[in-house]
Amino acid sequence: MVDLATVDYFSDQAVTQDPYAYYDYLRGCGPVFTEPHHGVVAVTGYDEVLAAFKDHESFSAVNAIGGPFPPLPFEPAGDDITEQIEAHRHEFPIFEHVVVMDPPAHTRARSLLAGLLTPKRLKENEEFIWRLTDTQLDEFIGTGACEFLFDYAKPYATLAITDLLGVPEEDRAEFRRALGAGHREGQHVGSLDGTPVGLNPLHYLDEKFSGYLTERRREPRGDVLSSLAAATYPDGSTPDLLEVVHPATFLFGAGQETVTKLLGAAVQTLGDRPDLQQTLRDNPALIPAFIEEALRIQSPTKIDFRLARKTTTLGGVPIKAGTVLMLCLGAANRDPRKFANPDEFRLDRKNVREHIAFGRGIHTCAGAPLARVEGRITIHRMLDRMRDIRISEAHHGPADRRRYSYEPTFLLRGLTELHIEFDPVG
């Protein structure tokens, strides 16, 4: 029996595979609790995580990706360290990307994304998503089996975002190969060895997207990249090229991670809960609720970080300026104070849309609407074209002794592989 009080969340391999007992332990110590190994304040309560997300005056997103790694590049001094944060911002991981910005810079950068993934544009793109879903399923459906992440989820997520953005057809195969190639320099996101993520792990995309956006500024094409190339700041000024390249590359890279992990969790649930398959076939209107519950119970982003810029309180607990906070989305979405029987997958959960898998407040995930569309259409077509979707016992063991492997990262929650078998329809 593991003594959870001794567990180091940031290096323990077992916790990456199943973090939920540890989250329960932390929550039992209090919804706002300082873990002993790194002095990080773990926020596990739903209300408390929500409050931190919404209070960007007190909590900076400057360390949202790295948390305690690397350590702060300065020694916090006083009850308001805003000036110190701004003086050292360029020393934090991915400092040029919107996910770690604070207002007013965040407000300006986010304004460039405001008109991109609108309901109207997603609706216009939906016909392509339906076609892409079938095209990707066609690659393996006749075999009655696949490794779902490699054969479907990863290429599908890449091709969906390349089409929506307007990446040229001739470059799409290259992106599919590159993004399936594994490790790239600077891509230590949530590494268990304490290695910090590089200052810009998406730099490999900058040259390509600089070219695309330069072309769109010269010759608009009516796609998302053209809208981004033409975007102006609220004051009417035109962004520099890199100021539009970075939102594009972040949307392109980070969005695929979220979609791939969501699809893996959803299909894993279908295989482990065969009773849900016919329920969803009989009533496809329940598929959106199924996707939301999959997001809640297996949040693709396990944690997000904040840095207290001011001495304040959270959930009645004093927080000193300079404190690193770990907002545990995976724990908050299973907080029994918010979600009844939180460890159960329930298709009829009335408040499921209140989960915070995509964050909340000014940093709500910009790609969330697209992820939901891709999840809904994928499950719909899989249920149409397959019967008896089941988890491969040869790879994952029998139903009562499943063996799943998750990515060894403290930040994200995603399977490393998912082997399924099924009976093709027709």
Identify the meaning behind each predicted range:
Residues M1-G426:
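Cytochrome P450
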